[in-house]
A protein has these predicted regions:
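Conserved core segment of the aminotransferase class I/II
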Residues: 233-308, 315-317
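N-terminal small-domain helix-loop-helix segment of the aminotransferase-like
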Residues: 2-5, 9-107, 114, 292-295, ...
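Helix C-cap/helix->beta junction micro-motif
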Residues: 143, 206-207, 358, 402
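Conserved glycine-rich beta-strand-loop-beta hairpin in the small C-terminal domain of fold type I
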Residues: 290, 307-315, 327-340
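PLP-dependent enzyme catalytic core of the Aspartate aminotransferase-like
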Residues: 353-362, 368-405
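Conserved core of the PLP fold type I
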Residues: 70-202, 219-237, 241, 403
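Short Gly/Ser/Thr- and Asp/Glu-enriched loop/turn motifs at secondary-structure junctions
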Residues: 98-99, 329-334, 374
Length: 405
């Protein structure tokens, strides 16, 4: 089957966060905030969901479930979903896990909040690498616990690596209880090597820390690469929790369905006991997730190839039009992490600048990515290439106008 990733789909007026909720999320404002551009004129390169239609194989499964006509209380009462997901894990990562370790939640973010509350007391802290996914810190703040940060080290080519000396110092803090490990890393797009994973694992095990490995981007990798779950490295470590989901890979975020794999039996029981949905799931979410893992393989491979082309397109654009910008093709994610430190004044509010001066919605800076992110923007490239081209052209023109002042 041929898949059309160049199709432009109108998402307005669907209550999509991407189109209808950006004021509150990016700018912490309501409808009173106005821009020189109409909402429909923005190029939206911000929140991490895709502008591509869902795989036809998944849509067919959803239509089939609709035809059953009843949408009563639903749970995972048979092994069909586990079998589909665990086979995907074996095929793609050469790894799987026992059925009893699988918990499902409406999302990884709710799981982060719940795990932090369950594992940490008020005098304890969580540790994150920076730049970081903001909800790692929000989960800690919600639970009333402290945050330790270990900045990733920037290399000469613009990519990042862990600073293991600093990471161990932070892990050794007596208050450190929990590490949020992002694998692949958001926003830098690093796929940690096996050596890096083993070094991090040895440190976390040495200090007997709980580890939440957020692996939601693990299937959004460059063609020819293979994800290494932290669980393949920490093979017997009982305090590891692995978080995966079909949502990012198959553009199903609104269906709110994620996999939380908890090894420790006691924690697993506490996690399930605190489940506000009592083990219930949305029947359409379950149908879509199962179909994704069973039938979505061909679409997934085509998606990766298209994303690789998008990254090459963006890399070439910056090299030609904005050579002072530092952009590398990441090993994973559909997110470009671009250093504009030499393009604009360091105190520039980048999301506000590009919204007002270019009509482009994006995220960036320390306010959204915790720290170690000044001068950086994160660009979502999971969209038709023609839209990316329009957005980049607007951004380059806005930067040139600003530089000419």
């Amino acid at each position: 089957m041929t898949y059309n990733f160049d199709e432009i789909i109108d998402r307005r007026h669907t209550n999509a966060l991407n189109t209808d909720g950006f004021r509150g999320y990016i700018f912490h404002a309501g409808p009173e905030k106005v821009f020189p551009y109409k909402d429909e004129e923005f190029v939206r390169m911000w929140v991490a969901d895709m502008e591509f239609g869902v795989a036809p194989e998944i849509l067919d499964a959803l239509r089939g479930r609709i035809d059953r006509r009843i949408f009563g209380y639903t749970g995972l009462y048979d092994d069909e979903y586990y079998n589909a997901f665990s086979k995907w894990c074996r095929d793609h990562y050469d790894w799987d896990f026992p059925r009893e370790q699988l918990c499902v939640t409406p999302g990884i973010i709710p799981a982060l909040y719940q795990l932090t509350e369950t594992l940490c007391t008020k005098d304890e802290k969580v540790l994150v690498n920076t730049p970081a996914y903001g909800y790692f810190v929000h989960a800690a703040e919600y639970a009333g616990v402290g945050v330790l940060t270990s900045p990733l080290r920037k290399k000469a080519d613009g990519t990042f690596e862990p600073d293991f000396e600093d990471f161990e110092r932070k892990c050794a803090d007596p208050a450190c209880k929990l590490v949020f490990w992002c694998n692949p890393q958001n926003p830098t797009g690093r796929m940690w090597t096996e050596e890096e994973l083993r070094k991090a694992a040895a440190i976390m095990e040495k200090y007997n820390l709980w580890v939440v490995s957020d692996e939601i981007h693990c299937d959004l990798i460059r063609c020819g690469r293979r994800h290494i779950p932290m669980a393949k490295v920490m093979t017997d470590y009982p305090k590891l929790i692995t978080c995966m989901a079909p949502s990012k890979t198959f553009n199903l975020a609104g269906l709110a369905f994620s996999n939380i794999i908890i090894r420790d039996k006691t924690l697993r029981g506490r996690f399930r006991d605190r489940d506000k949905l009592f083990g219930m799931v949305n029947p359409m979410s379950l149908t879509a997730a199962k179909a994704a893992y069973e039938r979505g393989g061909a679409w997934h491979e085509a998606l990766k190839a298209y994303l690789d082309g998008n990254f090459a397109f963006v890399k070439e654009f910056f090299a030609r039009e904005l050579p002072e910008a530092v952009m590398y093709i990441p090993e994973a994610t559909y997110l470009a992490w671009v250093d504009l430190g030499k393009c604009l004044p360091e105190d520039t509010d980048l999301p506000d600048f590009f919204a007002n001066k270019a009509g482009v919605l994006l995220e960036g800076g320390n306010g959204l990515f915790v720290g170690n992110a000044a001068g950086y923007i994160r660009l979502n490239l999971a969209m038709p290439r023609s839209i990316i081209g329009t957005g980049l052209k607007r951004m380059a023109e806005a930067i040139r106008r600003e530089q000419a002042k």
